[in-house]
Amino acid sequence: MDLDSPMGMAPMMGTARTGATILCCNCGVPIDGTSSAGALCYDCIKSTVDISQGIQREGTLHFCRDCERWLMPPSTWVAAAPESRELLSLCLKRLRNLGRVRIIDARFVWTEPHSRRIKVKITIQDQVSDGVLMQQSFEVVYVVAYQQCRECAKSYTANVWRAVVQVRQKVTHKRTFLLLEQLILKHQAHKDTINIKEEKDGVDFFFAQRNQAEAFVHFLKSVVPITLKDSRHLISQDTHTGDKQYKFTYSAEIIPICRDDLVALPLKLAKQIGNIPPLCLCYRIGTAVYLLDPNTLHTAELSSDVYWRQPFRPLADATSMVEFIVMDIEATGIRKGKWVLAEVTVARASDLGVNDNVYFTRTHLGHLLHPGDSVMGYMLTGTNFNSDTFDAIENSRQYGSTIPDVVLVKKHYPNRRRNRRRNWKLKRLPKDEGELLPKATDQARMDDEYEAFLRDVEEDEELRATLALYKNTRKTKKPQQDADAMSIAETEDDDDGPKISMDELLDDFEDLDIQDDQ
């Protein structure tokens, strides 16, 4: 019998290899045996394996209601808005054993605002066995607990400050402090203060740290001319480590010369700062005292260092000004910046109808004054200043014959009402008045000074550019009678004072009624 020769069996090209199929040991579903993990299907793995085991599902967040910050243990307080990235990061950092898995997604789940609960839904991923990745989502509930931070606790407790800046100016008014207050508010220089206390000759600013007080002192040097003295007081000492605790005091004294003051410079100093005539006006206060000679329009700058080498008092301040009426005015053609030099004849307002005394002088207000206008100025004729510096100027051969009878300072608007309604407002610092409240006379004087400052803001465009003015959206009370409303309207129409355009004003977000519609 013939036998066939053996033939080799080769697999056919293009035939795919099939894997072994097994049944899930738990539910009996057919699965691929070559890629299965422990003979379990994916659904059984999800039901029997918990990759979030060991991760806490509840937590506590501490919130300070005063400064609206959250506690990041052990002692750091961070600012975070509701449902913000910062708050979500803080929530994830508070969970234990979260670092051993991979975070795929995390988001907030809406809760009632008054429930004091924050829910976060977290999606994680981890390797189970034999390269099988499993993804799982779960929710974590945080309870919001109220706790006062250290800074807020210090602000409500006396004598917890570490540094104080005492700002003083030895004058009879606080006009410079009103300007300084607005500059502080505009630049937010008071944000680190724990208390602001008003004193007789100035204001005290209290800080929790020394570097905050030093930063505030640097700000003062950039806006007003000051001289600085510092001291420290030992409050405690550790005998074992040698550590010492100090309280620091910075005394900043502002030059006692204010805007619109009449200044009599010592003759030597007048030559030193630009050979300006010694009798001049202070037209602006900045990092230095800026002086103007109204007879020639010459200007000079008196720095703080130069002043304190030879300090002197102003010859007269704004409380000594009297009202004059312009009888005649003629411009000379000399101009410097906004000022126009003019020759003017004025009469004292109190002398009208009593005598015929008139005074001839030069003024820098040629761009503002017209015959019949009212102007405020200083009366030099017949005035005893009791000043050795002024006596030296009178006896000087060079300047004795140039002393005018009258020095005009600024235009006056007699028809302007005192407490008229303005379309703008200024913010004020939250100051502690101390143990003793101001007397009625002192309060009236402070109101007069503030009203004068508001008028200066209305009249001086350069001054307004350095301040932050806000729209006055406060609703006024409805008059009880129509006659009262008519009288108020007529008075405002007759008001000849300068007004501020709405384009120069900012919106005050504290007065806006913002509602979140959800």
From Swiss-Prot:
Ranges spanned by the short sequence motif Nuclear export signal, renumbered to the chain: 502-511
Sequence motif Nuclear localization signal, location on chain: 410-427
Keyword Lipoprotein in record: no
Bias (Acidic residues): 504-518
Compartments it resides in: Cytoplasm; Nucleus, Nucleoplasm
Disulfide bonds: none
Keyword list, A-Z: Coiled coil, Cytoplasm, Nucleus, Protein transport, Transport
Disordered as annotated region, ranges: 473-518
UniProt-listed GO biological process terms: protein transport; ribosomal large subunit export from nucleus
Taxon lineage: Eukaryota, Fungi, Dikarya, Ascomycota, Pezizomycotina
InterPro entries: Nmd3, Nmd3_N, NMD3_OB, NMD_SH3
Name assigned to this protein: 60S ribosomal export protein NMD3
GO molecular function: ribosomal large subunit binding
Biological function: Acts as an adapter for the XPO1/CRM1-mediated export of the 60S ribosomal subunit.
Keyword Coiled coil appears in the UniProt entry: yes
Family: Belongs to the NMD3 family.
Subunit structure: Associates with the 60S ribosomal subunit.
GO CC term (a single one): nucleoplasm
